[in-house]
Amino acid sequence: MAKAKFERNKPHCNIGTIGHVDHGKTSLTAAITKVLAETGGATFTAYDQIDKAPEEKARGITISTAHVEYETANRHYAHVDCPGHADYVKNMITGAAQMDGAILVVSAADGPMPQTREHILLARQVGVPALVVFLNKCDMVDDPELLELVEMEVRELLSKYDFPGDDIPIVKGSALAALENKDPKLGHDAILELMKAVDAYIPQPERPIDQPFLMPVEDVFSISGRGTVVTGRVERGIVKVGEEIEIVGLRDTQKTIVTGVEMFRKLLDQGQAGDNIGALLRGTKREEVERGQVLCKPGSVKPHTKFKAEAYILTKEEGGRHTPFFTNYRPQFYFRTTDVTGVVHLPEGTEMVMPGDNIAMEVHLIVPIAMEEKLRFAIREGGRTVGAGVVASIIE
């Protein structure tokens, strides 16, 4: 049979499986590819192919992640699955595999377990917009009342972490039944029902080009007779020649006009998400702009110094610290293109943070940075990465 070509004309969405160890995340991932392969929407990927996930580096941290792709009638999906709990923590915090939504896998035989709770909390902290639940191993539970009890527990746990627990779709089934062609109601049909719920409930992400313009400043040049040019890669949105923009971060916000956009030495009318451009700024002096600031649509991003973050601290083996740190720890925080010193305040009751921990903490930077929720950063000591984090919420 000829391999069906993936058509790229469907909207794209990034999702992943999360949940406690051995609750069936990888089996479910395999089962989805098996069931969707029947309609040519996937290539069946067996459990052991997914389980030996390759290692990859993200922000100086090694993470094992398996990627599969498949499509439903409505969407094309890129799906990530991680072999170990630590990989999930690192993946979600670094944003290595960005998730527009996630499938929370809970074993009906065990109910919610510690990592179930931790993954829901992480999803909340790092800003995963929506979750759908797959209650797995339902073929191991004979008592329908017990299933209802587990479902109630899961809904309560989701609500506790500010997800809409009462509204989140929960699909009951068995990934193993789907893989072994047993009990079609719990196997094959449940997988199709799950994908229908994912299609309907996980919102379509806004494409980067449709978001407000933002470009981190990488370099600044002055060109005699023309003015100041700043270079960088447009992170999102579009900037047109003649538009007003703001320069945000490190100092007071300034307004200016983009009088030219060039790429590969050619003049353009506009630059858009993904382009490496030089932007000519009207009336801006070379010393008024620096690396670490951003150019953005006026009013879209504000500079901040205090925020709450979720961070993962590297182990010694990963090249991180050898010793714990305490409150008032002062590393550098690398945002987009530059390091800024900040002071860490640990939560009440947390004495210290050991290498390998993930932790919610408060950070006070010594200078403001253009910042919004979900922004990723690295924690560094003298240029060496010792951790990774994400802005969970802004204080001021």
From Swiss-Prot:
Main location per the UniProt record: cytoplasm
Quaternary state and interactors: Monomer.
Region (G2) residue spans: 60-64
tr-type G domain sequence ranges: 10-206
Region of interest: G5: 174-176
Name of one Pfam family that matches: GTP_EFTU
Region (G3): 81-84
HAMAP family hit by this protein: EF_Tu_B
EC numbers on record: 3.6.5.3
Family: Belongs to the TRAFAC class translation factor GTPase superfamily. Classic translation factor GTPase family. EF-Tu/EF-1A subfamily.
Positions of the UniProt region annotated as G4: 136-139
Enzyme category, top tier: hydrolase
Reactions accelerated catalytically: GTP + H2O = GDP + phosphate + H(+)
Function recorded in the entry: GTP hydrolase that promotes the GTP-dependent binding of aminoacyl-tRNA to the A-site of ribosomes during protein biosynthesis.
Alphabetical list of PROSITE patterns matching this protein: G_TR_1, G_TR_2
Keywords, comma-separated and alphabetical: Cytoplasm, Elongation factor, GTP-binding, Hydrolase, Magnesium, Metal-binding, Nucleotide-binding, Protein biosynthesis
Organism for this UniProt entry: Rhodopseudomonas palustris (strain BisB18)
Gene name as annotated: tuf
MF (Gene Ontology): GTP binding; GTPase activity; guanosine tetraphosphate binding; translation elongation factor activity
Name under which the protein is recorded: Elongation factor Tu
Binding site for Mg(2+): 26
Subcellular location(s) per record: Cytoplasm
InterPro entries named among the record's database cross-references: EF-Tu_GTP-bd, EF-Tu_GTPase, EFTu-like_2, EFTU_2, G_TR_CS, P-loop_NTPase, Small_GTP-bd, T_Tr_GTP-bd_dom
Binding site for GTP: 19-26, 81-85, 136-139
GO cellular component: cytosol
Region annotation (G1) ranges: 19-26
